[in-house]
Structures are given as structure tokens and as C-alpha cells.
Amino acid sequence: QVCPYYKDLNDPRVVSSIALVHQRFSTNTFPSWELAHPYRMIAHNGEINTVKGNFNWLRARERAVETAVLGDDVKKLLPIIYEGQSDTACLDNMLELLVMSGYPLAQAVMLTIPEAWEQAKGQMDPAQRAFYEYYAAMLEPWDGPAAVGFTDGVRIGAVLDRNGLRPGRYILTNDDIVILASEAGTLPIPQSQIKKKWRLQPGKMFMIDTEQGRIIEDEEIKRTLALSNPYKEWTKRLNIHLSDVVAPPPLPNNNPVPLIKRQEAFGYGEDDIKFVLRPMAEKGAEAIGSMGNDTPLAMLSHRAKPFYQYFRQLFAQVTNPPIDPIREQLVMSLVSFVGPRPNLLDINNVNPPLRLELSQPILGMEEMAKMRRIDRYTGDKFRSYEIDTTYRVAWGEEGVEARLASLCARAVDAVKDGYNILILTDRKMSEERVAIPMPLAISAIHQHLIAAGLRTNTGLVIETGSAFQTHHMAVLAAYGAEAIHPYLALETIEQLYKPGNPSGIDVKTATQNYIHAIGKTFKKIMSKMGISTYMSYRGAQ
């Protein structure tokens, strides 16, 4: 099929020791030549579920990207990814950019499609795990069921996604021919000529170097790259774990507005406390309910609905398998980094910015107190700035737009003044002041900072009374939040589980259960889209 189409392939002078071929039917997109593989560097079987988030974050980086290899010419490459392309074309653009900026091909593949390193302590080589952790702050995974074949014309290889949801099988013949395909028996090779049969495993890589004339196995590839720099030392020096920061004394709660009034203002109902908060606080999991949702759509309801109700969660369709977040939790991760992001293309950066690492994005009272005073505990390396998202009731409906404009301007000024963590808070909500819906505030500031080329210089932390369900947290994460502090939900739990309460559960246990339940349900929401990591989900809209 290929040779009659490309006449030059019939010329006997065209000789190659490698070939990257792709043949399949289209399952969830209409077949067209624009979507045909291979692209410049890859061919791909599967789906990149995180492509929207990857695209958005790459756009956020474009204004700040610099590379010594390309110099000023890097600006000619913008936009790095064009809208309307397939997921494979986007990944191909990303991989090509990394390779052209100086990354070895195998390293570029490891950055974009990493193994599940987060839960692999004690199971993965420490140097290799440090490699992945170092680059995790620079680039979120391109995640989804994928078997990717790649080549730069000299080296050719393949890699499997972290879940191993697409097959990859290869054989080595006696005369040193290697055939790797999505299934065995692609070409009719007699059994007597087969020296070795094997398969790609989840997150593993297989590569052939035609210059060296040999096969390079996964362990050698990754071991060599992991030892090419002192990544273990770098992560120890650069990564600050919020859990390791000394806990400050708790901040006093001086809010003059009674708890019940604030609950009413933020849309809490008796059913929310009884069927949402209590099961989470007591059992560490969301309440079990029937499938489906027969309540009216928010836009058609006669009752005022929380802003979050206007959003719906997407789910994987057609050939795109969801993930089981319970049985496959080893490949899932809620790790989040808050603060400025290193320049991805500066491969020789000797003084990259520090990273503030969170094991999961939901902050308790103690963690929020640390975040608010982070400058004291990190020697001013991290500086937080609080932005009030409330406005005067007297301003009316017009006040929302005016306040959003001022919030965006304040965010830009704060980042330019050196604040690398912005805390958006609605704590000052009162009878005279109303809170802008937090999804509106975070999305406006997130997009404005992207347009100003400043989004990668700062982190966005949400402190809100409006979020108490996992769906609420997921909406905030999808619009750019690195961390979320649901203070009113936690205050409500404190009231419910005072000493002497009938359940016998203390406040500390109830709070830990609630945060654990949010994380557990968050994984379920991500898994419905076939996404394994919070870093890939965040900012994907």
C-alpha cells in the first residue's frame, strides 16, 4: 500500500535500516489524511487523554520559554502546538521541541511519558526515581492508553503508558531483525528464525541505536540517564515538602459572621451536611448512592444553585478505557507542585527555582497556616500574597466584572513584585461583602497570567468556603488551582465533632478522614477520564 503511493520508495537507492509504519482504522474521529501517522518523530496507538491540559500548559510556558540552543529563533516556533491538531500531532510537536532543544531522544520520551514513580518508593531505583521527581515540576505527564513508536532517524524505539493499556510485542530474529508491533505475528517469521520474543511492560521503553548497532533495554536507558546528573542531590536541595515545614501555631478564627450564616451564604444545606460531609468525616469515603442524576440541570432549576453545579464531569468513551482507582492506585498520583516552574528548555540550568511539593492538593488548617507564612519557613524563597475575592454588595451585578478586572491587575502586580504563591480567598465574605464564585475568580486570574506570560512564575492556592464536595474541588483544579483549602467545610466538621459528640470520633480523625475521602474521590473523577495524575488534570478545563 505504501510503495505505490510514495514512488520514491520504489527507487533502489532508497535504503534504510529502520521503518516506522502505522496502519489502523479511526475509532472516535473521522478518518482523514491530516490525522495519518507517522508524524515527524512518532506513531501512536491509543489516546492522550490529558492533551487539553498539556496544550494549555504549553501555551502558558510559551511566553517564558528560553533555550541556549535555539536562542532568539525559539520565538519563530510559536505557537509550539496549533489548535485543532490530533493528540498525536501535539505530542509529536512537544517531543520534537525537546529533542531540538538538546534533550536526548530517550530522555525526551521519559519526560513526556514517565513511569508511575510516585508510589514506587522502595521498588524503583532511587536515582531513577529522583530523575522523575526532578522533571515532574517542569512538565506534567502526557497520560492515556498509549503505545508510542518514536525515531530521530538514527535511533528507533517504543514506550508504553504507565498503565500498560495498549499492547506492544516484539521479536528478534537470528539475523538481527527486530519487529515490534501492537500484536504478535504481524509479519510471517518462521519460529525457527526467532531468537527472542517479549513484550513492552507498563512504562517501559525499548530502543535500537543504529550507530552503535545494538538493542538498548529499558534498564540501561534509564540507568544511564538517571546517573548523567546528580538528580538525587538536586531534588534534596530543591524540593521542599510542605509536610516537612515546621508547623506554625494555628491562626485564630476571628470571623465575626456566625458559622450558620456563612454556610447559608455559600449554599450549604442540611442534606449536604448529612449526606456529604458526615459520611466523609466518619468513614473516609463518600456516601454510596445510586447511579445517575435526576435533578434538574442548574440552568433550568428554579432554585439558586452553586456555581459548581453548572459544570459536568467528562468521561472516557469508545476505545478509551477508564482506570480502576482502587485496584490500580499504584499508578495514580495526587502529587502537586506549588510555585514557579523551571524553564523546561534550559537543560543546563545550574540554579533552578525551588519547588514546594504537596503529597495531595487538599490543605488542612495546619497546612494552610504554613502556606500563609511560607516566607518565614523558607527564608523568603517562597513568598505568598493574599488576594481577597469578595466585593461590596452595594456594587450590584456590575461589581463582578469590575472586581475581576482589579483581581487580575493585582495578581500581575504581585507576581512582578516577586510573590511566587498567590492565595485567592473569600474569607472576608460578610453581610456587606459578597464572594465572587471561586471558579470564576481562579479561571480569570489563571488566564490573565497566561496572557501576561507570568503563569509559570507563580502558584495559585484557593482558600474558599464554597467548596465542600469533591466535584467542587475538581472544578477548581481544572481551572488552574495547585492547592485548595476548603476552610468552611473543615470548620463545619470541627463543630460536628466537638468532644462529647455521639459518634465518638474526634475532630482530628474526622478532618483526616474528610481529606482522605476527597483524595480518594478525586482519583475516581480523574480515572473516569483515564487520567492518572493530578498534575495532568490540573488546568485542563
Residue ranges of model-derived segments:
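Short, solvent-exposed coil/turn linker segments
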Residues: 1-8, 104, 217, 364, ...
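Conserved short alpha-helical segments that host acidic/polar catalytic motifs at enzyme active sites
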Residues: 1-349, 375-377
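Glycine-rich phosphate/ribose-binding loops and adjacent secondary-structure elements
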Residues: 16, 21-75, 101, 115-147, ...
